Amino acid sequence: MSTSRKLKSQGTRRGKNRTPHKGVKRGCSKRKYRKSSLKSRKRCDDANRNFRSHL
């Protein structure tokens, strides 16, 4: 039971965190990364992580 629970929590967490991050990084890097500096990209990533975790 413990293994199943661990796998479930990890899978849901990873799936939710991994896919959006990839899409965000790709979309952000194409549009904002070129225009602004690395600091901005980090901020966008952080905001997205917070937004996703709340969702």
UniProtKB/Swiss-Prot annotation:
Residues 1-55 are annotated as: Disordered. It holds the Pfam family TP1. It comes from the Eukaryota. It is found in: Nucleus; Chromosome. Residues 1-42 have a biased composition (Basic residues). One of its GO terms (biological process) is chromatin remodeling. GO terms for cellular component: male germ cell nucleus; nucleosome; nucleus. One of its GO terms (molecular function) is DNA binding. InterPro entries: Nuclear_transition_prot1 (IPR001319), Nuclear_transition_prot1_CS (IPR020062). Its main location: nucleus. The modification Phosphoserine is found at S9, S36, S37, S40. Keywords: Chromosome, Developmental protein, Differentiation, DNA-binding, Nucleosome core, Nucleus, Phosphoprotein, Spermatogenesis. Testis. Belongs to the nuclear transition protein 1 family. Plays a key role in the replacement of histones to protamine in the elongating spermatids of mammals. In condensing spermatids, loaded onto the nucleosomes, where it promotes the recruitment and processing of protamines, which are responsible for histone eviction. This is Spermatid nuclear transition protein 1. It comes from Ovis aries (Sheep). The lineage of its organism: Eukaryota, Metazoa, Chordata, Craniata, Vertebrata.
